[in-house]
Regions:
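Glycan-recognition and catalytic cores of secretory/periplasmic carbohydrate-active enzymes
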Residues: 1-227
Length: 227
């Protein structure tokens, strides 16, 4: 009836900005309410998240939890984890409520410690996909996570330098010939090897514009850290 995707966390930045620009706190309150409900319903005990939570539109109860673009409902779809890490980092930035940063870190640590995380730190499209290591990687998840980690490293968190160092390792991999396309190739996209949705047979092992976006954002954030 009312499916809500973890991707929506990325849109809350617009609502926070709308309050700043308009002076109307309604947008801020909507963003916080959305983040809080997502916090309570989208996450598993280990910190990983579902892709979709379907709500009953009449009473707000949960009808179903699933992972539409991942391997299975209970699997760890990599880009969903990236949206969660980045989105809750946004919420911490805008509210300074520590619970949001704690969730971002918990989800990141779940990804970092996944036994299937490759040595180059570019995740498989789903960390529970059945044919690992012969599964497509997802550079878009990696670039989004790296960008979020650079922001996290600027906050008063224990071992902040380790988040920066982990992001550096991701970016080193993405900038290598394994993932960064030669000039004039790859449809003029920067990064190769992203995945849209394997269950929908859509955008498999291709360049994606948002992979490039977060790669460029991460590069800028990394440069800003040296100022």
């Amino acid at each position: 009836e009312c499916p809500v995707i973890i991707d929506n966390m990325m849109n809350l930045e617009l609502l926070f900005e709308a309050t700043k620009l308009s002076g109307d706190s309604t947008f801020y309150k909507v963003a916080v309410a959305h983040a809080d409900r997502t916090l309570s319903e989208h996450f598993r005990p280990d910190g990983s998240c579902y892709h979709v939570v379907d709500y009953n539109i009449s009473d707000g109860s949960v009808r179903h939890k699933q992972t539409a673009q991942g391997y299975a409902d209970e699997s760890v779809w990599s880009r969903g984890q990236a949206w969660a890490i980045y989105g809750f980092t946004i919420c911490y930035r805008e509210t300074k409520d520590r619970k949001y940063l704690d969730q971002a870190l918990k989800t990141f640590n779940r990804m970092k410690n996944d036994p299937h995380m490759p040595e180059d730190l570019i995740p498989y499209w789903d960390m529970d996909a059945p044919n690992i290591p012969n599964e497509p990687r997802d550079a878009s998840s990696a670039s989004c996570i790296a960008s979020a980690l650079y922001e996290i490293s600027t906050y008063a968190v224990s071992d902040a330098a380790s988040y920066k160092a982990y992001a550096d390792r991701i970016m080193h991999s993405l900038a290598s010939p394994d993932y960064r396309a030669a000039l004039g190739t790859n449809g003029n996209f920067i990064l190769m090897h992203s995945v849209g949705s394997i269950p929908h047979n859509s955008e498999i092992d291709v360049p994606l514009n948002y992979a490039d976006y977060y790669f460029l954002e991460a590069l800028k954030r990394r440069k800003d850290l040296d100022k």
